[in-house]
Amino acid sequence: MPVVKGGVWTNIEDEILKASVSKYGLNQWARVSSLLARKTPKQCKARWNEWLDPSIKKIEWSKEEDEKLLHLAKLMPTQWRTIAPIVGRTANQCLERYQRLLDEAEQREASALGLTGPDGGEAHAPSADDVRKLRPGEVDPDPETKPARPDTIDLDEDEKEMLSEARARLANTQGKKAKRKARERQQEESRRLAALQKRRELKTAGINIKVTTKKQGQMDYNADIPFEKKPVPGFYDTTEEMSRNEYQRAHFDPKKQQVGNKRKGEEDERDGKRRKGDKDPSVQAALKAGQLQKMREAEQSSKRRALVLPAPQVGEGELEEIVKMGMIGERANMLARESDNDATRGLINNYSTLNTNAPIRTPMAPAQEDHIANEIRNIRALTETQSSLLGGENTPLHQGVGSTGFESVAPRKQVMSTPNPLATPLRAAGAGPGATPLRVGQTPLRTPRDTFALNDAGDEMSMVGGTPRDVKMREMSIRHQLKQGLASLPKPKETEWELELPDDQQEPKTAEQLEEDAAERDRREREIREARELLERKRRTQVMQRDLPRPVQVDYQSLLKEASQAEDPVKVLIAREAALLVAHDATKYPLPGAQPTGRALEIQKIDDAALQEAKLQVLMEIKDKPKPEEVQAVWEKSNSSSLLLGLGCYEDDEEEEQISTMQIALEEVIDQIVASAEKGNKLEKKLNLHLGGYKNRAEMLRKKISEAHEALEKANNALGAFKVLQSSEQAAIRNRLAALREEVGFVSTREREAQELYRRTREELDALTLNGPKANGFR
């Protein structure tokens, strides 16, 4: 019984087709179809070109692709094989998307007109998807463009035979062709090694030859780097990378790494044993999905870059200088306003407040038209209109800006470039729409605090984009106007003036008291404070000056009692003074973390001169330093014994006692570590409980700020594009109006001439009719 080839593709057939294409290529479809008992070569080729080809895009259609599809469908109707490579989809995908767009547009219009019918799903009219669905008994005409049918649990005998034959043929590596390929690979490897050996010998002999074994369109993996992306030439700051590397190197612990690798190996071994025990296909699918999710997360984390913020434009020093300049200017204004000279007061005005009468507002981006809907209306209007042979008006179509934006195969794109000052409307003194406003309004282009009207509208503002020649010509014209104005002044009257100089009066001299600069005052006060601190530090004890350790708790009474037991009265005084100093330092200057009890004892303040005299007397009473030979002899004597100091008392201890002591110490350390870990966990939970909401709020605000910034950038780009488009459209409108006026004038002239010709011809005809001969009583 012959087998009817065709029908729905199965998953097994798809896998066999992909494996056979990888072996036989894209030209031997007869050999590929020999592995599939139910498919023809034409069906195999169609299946590969319409579904299995990795270059086929199966993602959602973008707006640009829809616009390009509709425009090309208008230019080349029903030529889907030609449209498909331009759009980047298959012909069947283009046709289905085109029909779906038309159906969606028709459905929107029907819903807008209220053509929904009565309520209830059974009473509604069938949709486009319902109409295209296959009815029971119908055969899909294009099964190559549909997803594969899942494999059944129990395969047919024909499918099992086909699968086994395909496995055997695709796994054949001992045939003539496989042996020839292996032999060719071996010969290629031997040639490569021979060339390498020859090149090495020539290099040792001082001869360098260039390797030219690279083929066109291929890569030499021995010389080139796969997927290499060379950085842009230039200088880069690697300080952050070096600091990050040093930080990682300092915090790297090889022991932790070894323990982590060991634990990871143990966990992988346990997971492998557990996977072997799980035979459920759903469990296997879940594990595979989890692995894919981990891979995607790893890719996302590797793609994520560190946040690089720009350096501040103004530093702290510059801010301080700006503040000082403002204070100096304000002080000068105050002095000028307090002066008795009217001329000085007239030249000073208030420049401290801003003109906030015209606040700057963020412009709203204009609403955009639905280009896809307009193009669909054009297509429907062209398909549903009657023939042009019947006459009537043409169907109105959306063209120009309201269409898809395609003038050819590629869309229109406004290229943002630096404006040319000779071509932009900046030099036209604000003429024309889209020009930069040259007067003070919503966008102030001059100083908002111009009290003396120094910046006139149309003065320098109109020369923003002017060339140096234009600026020079304008200066010359202003100078000429000034000369003309001075020349037009009336001549002064001839009057004799007598000036009497007032008597010189000696003004009382007042001592000018200049206010000291804040920085100089701060520096002087800081030096005085540092000198006082240094002097106070020198008055302290040597223990405090050298920052030596001090006792946490001091029993002053016990120290006094011990000092009183000495026989020498001088030593008693010295011991009492030492006890007083120790107690004073421990109480007044405690160690960090210590909590002294009681109040610091008062010590007698000694004059600096008396203190220096006492130090001098002490130095005179101190014995001379020992000679280096004596110190060396004592050192050799103390280090001649190999026994460490303090270990003599441990010679008789038993080994078991030492082990027990060390075990007790180890247990105490472990208990302390566990207690510290528990305390840290509690603190971490407490902080997460108190600060979790703030962290989430900060993350949400950060995302909103980034989204708002992106939206603002897009709106600014759109605004600039539409401004450029508006200026170009205004220029084109004038040209088109002039051309239309010329055409209308030409048509009017021709019509007038034709009317004149018709009038003369009519008059001649009437004259001939009146003056002509009569025949049978009729003219």
Curated annotation (Swiss-Prot):
Spell out the SUPFAM superfamilies in the cross-references.
Homeodomain-like
Question: Which Gene3D superfamilies does the record match to this protein?
Answer: Homeodomain-like
GO biological process, alphabetically ordered: mRNA cis splicing, via spliceosome; mRNA splicing, via spliceosome
Return the Basic and acidic residues bias intervals. Answer: 127-152, 246-256, 263-281
Q: Which residues form the HTH myb-type domain?
A: 1-56, 57-106
- InterPro entries hit by this protein: CDC5L/Cef1, Cdc5p/Cef1_C, Homeodomain-like_sf, Myb_dom, SANT/Myb, SANT_CDC5L_II
Task: Provide the residue span(s) of the region labelled Disordered.
Answer: 113-192, 246-284, 424-448, 497-525
Q: Which GO terms describe its cellular component?
A: cytosol; nucleolar peripheral inclusion body; post-mRNA release spliceosomal complex; Prp19 complex; spliceosomal complex
Has keyword Coiled coil? yes
Q: Name one Pfam family in it.
A: Myb_Cef
Which residues does UniProt call coiled coil? 157-204, 653-772
Q: Which organism is it from?
A: Neurospora crassa (strain ATCC 24698 / 74-OR23-1A / CBS 708.71 / DSM 1257 / FGSC 987)
Q: In its keyword annotation, does this UniProt entry include Lipid metabolism?
A: no
Which key words are in the record? Answer: Coiled coil, Cytoplasm, DNA-binding, mRNA processing, mRNA splicing, Nucleus, Repeat, Spliceosome
This protein is called Pre-mRNA-splicing factor cef-1
Q: Which residues bind DNA?
A: 29-52, 80-102
Location comes to: Cytoplasm; Nucleus
UniProt family annotation: Belongs to the CEF1 family.
Chain segments annotated as transmembrane: none
Q: How does it assemble?
A: Associated with the spliceosome.
GO MF, one term, reads:
DNA binding
Q: Spell out the CDD domains in the cross-references.
A: SANT, SANT_CDC5_II
- Which gene is transcribed and translated to give this protein? cef-1
Protein task: Involved in pre-mRNA splicing and cell cycle control.
